[in-house]
Amino acid sequence: MGIKGLNAIISEHVPSAIRKSDIKSFFGRKVAIDASMSLYQFLIAVRQQDGGQLTNEAGETTSHLMGMFYRTLRMIDNGIKPCYVFDGKPPDLKSHELTKRSSRRVETEKKLAEATTELEKMKQERRLVKVSKEHNEEAQKLLGLMGIPYIIAPTEAEAQCAELAKKGKVYAAASEDMDTLCYRTPFLLRHLTFSEAKKEPIHEIDTELVLRGLDLTIEQFVDLCIMLGCDYCESIRGVGPVTALKLIKTHGSIEKIVEFIESGESNNTKWKIPEDWPYKQARMLFLDPEVIDGNEINLKWSPPKEKELIEYLCDDKKFSEERVKSGISRLKKGLKSGIQGRLDGFFQVVPKTKEQLAAAAKRAQENKKLNKNKNKVTKGRR
């Protein structure tokens, strides 16, 4: 699910922390990718012309394999070395969220049964998409044959991706879930595995710039995210994103906010603190997640196992042999050529000061107003 409203807060208060770039900008980078999130995207987006999932002659779903194979090739073509991280066992605190998701599935199944148009059926079918154990195992087999490293995290994939980035094994964590920032990955890449046809730029979010720009410690930032709404527990009812940020900046922690509300000083009867609220446990899952120490992980990209890959994709899954062989050639070329060094690897990056961040944010707001005024003038001339 991620963190509700976090992207909007960062976009408004620290726009300079989000850099929008073409995939070519990440040439020479190693990236840890949230595999479970990617597989979900592929199952949703990689479809036949009639809107149904891709299947082979035996009726087995192949959308996830098609997406994994070709999106990985696209990264390799652009000089990126991807590694994938799969979810392990979900934390116990996530059981409430998983129960809610199961309830929503039951409701969606009812709506699907009642749907009268093909468009409505397709809409409900996509809401029922779920990454299964079999999908994960098939994707892991594919990656192994491609020579692309993957890791099965003890619990949350995003936490393990962040750990790899923090220990310098990769440049960034890639996921659509904004909660990846709570694990303090140096950089979060969003939209990396999107289809090229979408023409959506990759959003690179700098965690340190976010913290500096919001003037929050990582502990306060995590508390803000819990207040906004995360997968681990409920948030205070009646408190929206704007108020949540204001409360954290004023009081500094959830403990102080709870005291403020319970004392009656807030004069707001609409704010309701959840009963037995496990925010402290949620906080620790973000600040001290269960991960494999990044220093103990050795990521290795190997030549693809050409014969086995053709057997798996073409013989078993009925992919086009011509296209698969072409893909293997691209893969061999990309992995063999290695990764050239980047110029910025020779220089120390100096963090921006609060004054520089404020100036950048001011410039961004001024440019926004200027563009609005230009649009008004253009419309007036018409």
Curated annotation (Swiss-Prot):
Compositionally biased intervals (Basic residues): 370-382
List of residues binding DNA: R47, R71, E156, G229, D231
Cofactor list: Mg(2+)
One GO CC annotation: nucleoplasm
Annotated stretches, region: I-domain: 120-251
PANTHER family given in the database record: FLAP ENDONUCLEASE 1, FLAP ENDONUCLEASE FAMILY MEMBER
One GO MF term: magnesium ion binding
Protein name listed in UniProt: Flap endonuclease 1
GO biological process annotation, one example: base-excision repair
Key word NAD present: no
Native species: Saccharomyces cerevisiae (strain ATCC 204508 / S288c)
Resulting phenotype, G67S: Deficient in double and single flap endonuclease cleavage and exonucleolytic cleavage
Location(s) in or outside the cell: Nucleus, Nucleolus; Nucleus, Nucleoplasm; Mitochondrion
Record-listed Mg(2+) 1 binding positions: D34, D87, E156, E158
Subunit structure: Interacts with PCNA (POL30). Three molecules of RAD27 bind to one PCNA trimer with each molecule binding to one PCNA monomer. PCNA stimulates the nuclease activity without altering cleavage specificity.
